[in-house]
């Protein structure tokens, strides 16, 4: 599987901060470097991942209510990371809206940032089987004099790259930012930034790149074209992968859905959730932060015949509109308070764009080599055929931390 995300708070995702430039700006003092103790960071990260999961489900529900049909694919972790870093520069009601909207209100600012710091350290890795890169960058106008405390904390806590940029030359600036995002996402996110507002003085980007190999790969010879039932009476042809294996499986009678977990190598798992016919809406509305714990208690090992469509989907979202409906609006307005970034009171987030791409095939990741086989007990296999709209979640097992969330409506 190849998962790539762009976030531009103008989040790949991308963020733009707009405002007036003045000649004088009193810098704040540097804070001493942040040192996170292992036990404290892990505790904060675990709490953070629970809140992030709750935010992800809330966001999916909002997007699903806006569009009953169509694919949804996003990274709650990427969006939360970008706005948490941005919250270092916010105060008063602007900060409280971010904390409330992202479900961080139960955590102190210190614990929230320490949790992200620990999480980013643990998730960033590259091995033969797993490649995961999560990063942030701040593109700042050469004339802007940001608060030094903000820059220091963004670097210490979020390892953000600080890149001086000439926003008066928008054409070259746009090219350079797009090259940066493309390079960081292994050329998967192209042309993330378009039509930068002339008033932009700072642009924040966040990206996630993930490549993972299935623990047990599908045999391409078993892949066949089959019907995928989008809705009653309407089907599309899709390449359907097949595998018989031993997997964790369960049925949730309250949400009328079947759950199947398929592991990647390296403590990453894909969870597929297939609702009963006509129950997709019920499933979406029933998602909440403790659902994983509930499903874990129901799961048991089964021999399962699994059919999964080969996927290649991409999605782009205007997060400004979506987050405003979740009560996060001041950060986009003239009277928002981002004075911990700069003393200029006219600073605001101009755009917030989230872009993600998903490729899933028999190997897991394009071009991955090798194969695996399971020794299966002699029993009649269960069936899990993903040939109708379903939900999918990609998460890291140890926290556990949700990285990607999707509704596959039309592969």
Swiss-Prot record:
Gene name in the database record: Serpina12
Description of how the protein assembles with itself and partners: Forms a stable complex with KLK7.
Descriptive protein name: Serpin A12
Function: Adipokine that modulates insulin action by specifically inhibiting its target protease KLK7 in white adipose tissues.
InterPro entries: Serpin_dom, Serpin_fam, Serpin_sf, Serpin_sf_1, Serpin_sf_2
Summary of the tissues where the protein is detected: Expressed in visceral adipose tissues.
Signal peptide: 1-20
Site (Cleavage): 378-379
Gene3D superfamilies: Alpha-1-antitrypsin, domain 1, Antithrombin, subunit I, domain 2
GO annotations of cellular component type: extracellular space; plasma membrane
Keyword hit for Membrane: no
Superkingdom as given in the UniProt entry: Eukaryota
Activity control note: Inhibition of KLK7 is enhanced by heparin.
Molecular-function GO terms, alphabetical: molecular function inhibitor activity; serine-type endopeptidase inhibitor activity
Family annotation (SMART domains): SERPIN
Record localization: Secreted
Carbohydrate-modified residues: 92, 267
Record note on domains: The reactive center loop (RCL) extends out from the body of the protein and directs binding to the target protease. The protease cleaves the serpin at the reactive site within the RCL, establishing a covalent linkage between the carboxyl group of the serpin reactive site and the serine hydroxyl of the protease. The resulting inactive serpin-protease complex is highly stable.
Keyword set, alphabetical order: Glycoprotein, Protease inhibitor, Secreted, Serine protease inhibitor, Signal
């Amino acid at each position: 599987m190849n998962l790539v995300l762009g976030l531009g708070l103008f989040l790949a995702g991308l963020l733009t901060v707009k405002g007036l430039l003045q000649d004088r700006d009193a810098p704040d003092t540097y804070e001493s470097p942040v040192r996170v103790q292992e036990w404290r960071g892990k505790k904060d990260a675990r709490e953070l991942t629970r809140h992030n999961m709750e935010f992800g489900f809330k966001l999916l529900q909002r997007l699903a209510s806006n569009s009953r049909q169509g694919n949804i694919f996003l990274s709650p972790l990427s969006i939360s990371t970008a706005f948490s870093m941005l919250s270092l520069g916010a105060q008063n009601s602007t900060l409280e809206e971010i904390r409330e909207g992202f479900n961080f209100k139960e955590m102190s600012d210190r614990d929230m940032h320490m949790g992200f710091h620990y999480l980013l350290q643990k998730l960033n890795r590259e091995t033969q089987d797993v490649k995961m890169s999560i990063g942030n960058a701040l593109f700042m106008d050469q004339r802007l004099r940001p608060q030094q405390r903000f820059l220091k904390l963004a670097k210490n806590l979020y390892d953000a790259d600080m890149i001086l940029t000439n926003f008066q030359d928008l054409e070259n600036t746009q090219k350079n930012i797009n090259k940066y995002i493309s390079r960081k996402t292994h050329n998967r996110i192209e042309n993330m930034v378009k039509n930068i507002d002339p008033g932009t003085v700072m642009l924040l980007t966040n990206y996630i790149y993930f490549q993972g190999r299935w623990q047990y790969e599908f045999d391409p010879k078993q892949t066949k074209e089959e019907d995928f039932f989008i809705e009653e009476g309407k089907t599309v042809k899709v390449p359907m992968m097949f595998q018989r294996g031993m997997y964790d499986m369960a049925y949730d009678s309250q949400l009328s859905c079947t759950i199947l977990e398929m592991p990647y190598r390296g403590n990453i798992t894909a969870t597929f959730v297939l609702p009963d016919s006509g129950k997709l809406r019920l499933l979406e509305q029933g998602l909440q932060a403790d659902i994983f714990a509930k499903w874990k208690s129901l799961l048991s090992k089964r021999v399962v015949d699994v059919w999964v469509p080969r996927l290649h989907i991409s999605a782009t979202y205007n997060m400004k509109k979506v987050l405003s409906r979740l009560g996060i609006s001041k950060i986009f307005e003239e009277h928002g308070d981002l004075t911990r970034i700069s003393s200029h009171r006219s600073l605001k987030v101009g755009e917030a764009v989230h872009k993600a791409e998903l490729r899933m095939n028999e190997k897991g990741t394009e071009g991955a080599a090798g194969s695996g086989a399971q020794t299966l007990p002699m029993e009649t296999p269960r069936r899990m055929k993903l040939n109708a709209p379903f939900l999918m979640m990609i998460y890291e097992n140890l926290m556990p931390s949700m990285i990607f969330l999707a509704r596959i409506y039309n592969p």
